[in-house]
């Protein structure tokens, strides 16, 4: 090889390395992740207090949730799992000097980013770096001493595996008639039952009126019969 006038193949020609991800794709993914903790999940508007989060760890402006609950048609990306304010928890957030939301962990002093995932505690809503809560021994909020269970630590913008766990938590809460905020779920009014009750009430009312009329008629007949008997006795006495 090489003595016949040909050229030897180089290593790069023989070994194919995996293609590198273009820098633009990396920047795009980072910008998407960044928008998830800086923009409202249903309106894409910048997040501003009061900020709330659902059981799936997404962030919303509370004003947007209120608007959605009043008129779902006004919010194209309306999440079906949010049926009332009980299905969200208001987060305890701080503002920086410029008035923007500051996601700062009081334990690690890290700022929430695509590098540091954050989570919040239900029901108090205090926000921490997720890894710090995992390492924290006591199940008591570092800020307010609220006792909590591990399942009520909600990762913000969860990955696929975390999302499965959160979905199961919501299902378990629904079976126990509770909401994401751990408040009791509102019972839906049974329209058919209400109609039946109204129908029965009307029927009972009609029956009562009919019974009253019947009693009055019977009372009238009794009065007439008593009067006729008295008159007959008077006639007999006169004849005698």
UniProtKB/Swiss-Prot annotation:
The keyword Nucleus applies. It comes from Schizosaccharomyces pombe (strain 972 / ATCC 24843) (Fission yeast). Residues 211-224, 231-240 have a biased composition (Basic and acidic residues). GO terms for cellular component: nucleus; spliceosomal complex. Transmembrane segments: none annotated. Disruption phenotype: Increases intron retention in a subset of pre-mRNAs, including rtf1/Replication termination factor 1. Decreases replication fork arrest at the RTS1 replication fork barrier. Sensitive to methane methylsulfonate. No sensitivity to hydroxyurea. Interacts with pcn1. PANTHER family: PROTEIN C20ORF43 HOMOLOG, REPLICATION TERMINATION FACTOR 2. Putative splicing factor that is required for the correct splicing of a subset of pre-mRNAs. Required for the correct splicing of rtf1, a replication termination factor that mediates site-specific replication termination at replication barrier RTS1. Residues 1-22, 181-240 are annotated as: Disordered. It is found in: Nucleus. This is Splicing factor rtf2. Belongs to the rtf2 family. Keywords: mRNA processing, mRNA splicing, Nucleus. Residues 185-210 have a biased composition (Basic residues). GO terms for biological process: mitotic DNA replication termination; mRNA splicing, via spliceosome. SUPFAM superfamilies: RING/U-box. It comes from the Eukaryota. The gene is rtf2. InterPro entries: Rtf2, Rtf2_RING-finger, Znf_RING/FYVE/PHD. Its main location: nucleus.
């Amino acid at each position: 090889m090489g003595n016949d006038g040909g050229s030897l193949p180089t290593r790069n020609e023989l070994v194919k390395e995996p293609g590198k991800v273009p820098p633009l794709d990396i920047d795009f993914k980072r910008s998407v992740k960044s928008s998830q903790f800086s923009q409202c999940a249903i309106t894409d508007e910048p997040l501003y207090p009061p900020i709330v989060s659902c059981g799936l760890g997404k962030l919303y402006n509370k004003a947007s949730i209120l608007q959605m609950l009043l008129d779902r048609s006004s919010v194209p990306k309306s999440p079906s799992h949010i049926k009332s304010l009980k299905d969200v928890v208001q987060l305890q957030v701080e503002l920086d000097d410029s008035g923007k939301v500051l996601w700062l962990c009081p334990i690690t002093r890290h700022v929430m980013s695509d590098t540091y995932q954050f989570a919040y505690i239900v029901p108090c809503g205090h926000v921490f770096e997720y890894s710090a809560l995992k390492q924290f021994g006591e199940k008591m909020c570092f800020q307010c001493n609220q006792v909590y269970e591990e399942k009520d630590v909600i990762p913000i913008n969860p990955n696929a595996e975390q999302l499965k766990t959160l979905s199961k938590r919501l299902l378990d809460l629904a079976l126990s008639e509770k909401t994401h905020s751990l408040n009791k779920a509102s019972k839906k009014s049974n329209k058919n039952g209400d109609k039946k009750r109204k129908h029965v009430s009307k029927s009972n009312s009609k029956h009562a009126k009919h019974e009253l009329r019947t009693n009055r008629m019977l009372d009238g007949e009794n009065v007439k019969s008593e009067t006729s008997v008295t008159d007959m006795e008077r006639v007999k006495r006169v004849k005698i």
